[in-house]
Structure formats: structure tokens, C-alpha cells
Amino acid sequence: MARKQQTRKRRVKKNIESGIAHIRSTFNNTIVTITDMQGNAVSWSSAGALGFRGSRKSTPFAAQMAAETAAKTSLEHGLKTLEVTVKGPGAGREAAIRALQAAGLEVTAIKDVTPVPHNGCRPPKRRRV
């Protein structure tokens, strides 16, 4: 019996001039999501999605590669200017911002939106190595 050929949905190129780059940098990973001004995702990438595993995932180089990958796909959608919001204490914060600038995107503003508790949850105990 003949198989029914699946029709693949093509990615529609959105013509977006400006957007927001959300950089979520934790101690274990860095996730870069580029959205339009309303918050609809245009492209995303992370260190883990690029094949970095274990301790290599939390390096600035992995964050740089994740930002470059997200920037390349957003440039295809016509993105030119970015506002950057950075969240978290990770090692890849500055590396990701520099990679976005190097990819040809103009960074207009950088905001730190790291959530700071008003003495909420107890933090995890200190590591003894």
C-alpha cells in the first residue's frame, strides 16, 4: 500500500525590524530566545541544544555559540535591532551579548531582570568540594 506523503510546514519568514533577546543564564546552561516586541518567539537556541553536555554546557563559549545560532536564524527573519534582557547568575551572560553584537545585530538596550527574592526560599546549602 502506498504511503501518504506528508506535507511539511515551511517556516514563514516574518519581517521584523526590532525584537527582544531574552538570555537566561543559569549555572548549568544558557538559553537565548529572540522574540518580537510582543514576546512571540522568532528563534531560540541553548548550549544543551547545540550538543554541549555536562560542565561544557555552562561555559561562556557554549553561551556564545547559542547566541550566534539564535542570531543567525533571526537575521533571516529581517531582524536588525535588539533589546537584551539578561536573567540569572551564569557564566555566559556577557559572552552571549557580545556574540549577538558580533552577529550583526544592533543592541539598543541591556536590562538585567534577574529575580531577587525579598527573603523568600532558603538557598541550597554551600558545596564542600
Curated annotation (Swiss-Prot):
* Gene Ontology biological process terms in this record: translation
* Coiled coil regions in record: none
Q: Which Pfam families match?
A: Ribosomal_S11
Task: List the protein's name.
Answer: Small ribosomal subunit protein uS11
Q: Which GO terms describe its cellular component?
A: ribonucleoprotein complex; ribosome
Species classification = Bacteria, Bacillati, Bacillota, Bacilli, Bacillales
Instruction: Report the leader peptide range.
Output: none
Assembly notes: Part of the 30S ribosomal subunit. Interacts with proteins S7 and S18. Binds to IF-3.
Question: InterPro entries in the record, alphabetically?
Answer: Ribosomal_uS11, Ribosomal_uS11_bac-type, Ribosomal_uS11_CS, Ribosomal_uS11_sf
What does it do?
Answer: Located on the platform of the 30S subunit, it bridges several disparate RNA helices of the 16S rRNA. Forms part of the Shine-Dalgarno cleft in the 70S ribosome.
A molecular-function term among this protein's GO annotations:
structural constituent of ribosome
> Which family is it part of?
Belongs to the universal ribosomal protein uS11 family.
| Keywords from the UniProt entry | Ribonucleoprotein, Ribosomal protein, RNA-binding, rRNA-binding
NCBIfam families per the UniProt record, alphabetical: PRK05309.1, uS11_bact
